[in-house]
Amino acid sequence: MTLQEAIKEIISQNYKTGDIFDSHSVIFLLSRNEKYAETYMKNISPEMNIKQYHAHIAKNISFFDDCVEAVDEKIITLNIFGELSKNQVWKRK
C-alpha cells in the first residue's frame, strides 16, 4: 500500500460527508493503526525529520480534492508528540 492509498483509505473509512478533521488525526491513525503503520514507517525519508514528514503527509491530504476540501481556518491541536501546534483543517465532501 502506498502512502497516498493509506491516506485516502483513512479519510474514506473514518470521516463522513460534512465531517471536519485535521491533519493530526490522519497522522495519528496512519502511525498507530496496525494496518497502516508499516506504510507510515517505510515512507520516512532519511532527509526529513519527523515534523517535515508530517508536513509532507498533511500536504498529501490536499491532493484528494475529490473527497476533501481545505477549510480556510487553521486549528491548534495536539500533535503526535503531545505538543500544541497549528495545522490545516479539512472538510469531507
Locate the predicted segments by residue:
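Phospho-regulated, low-complexity intrinsically disordered regions of nuclear gene-regulatory
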Residues: 1-14, 24, 29-93
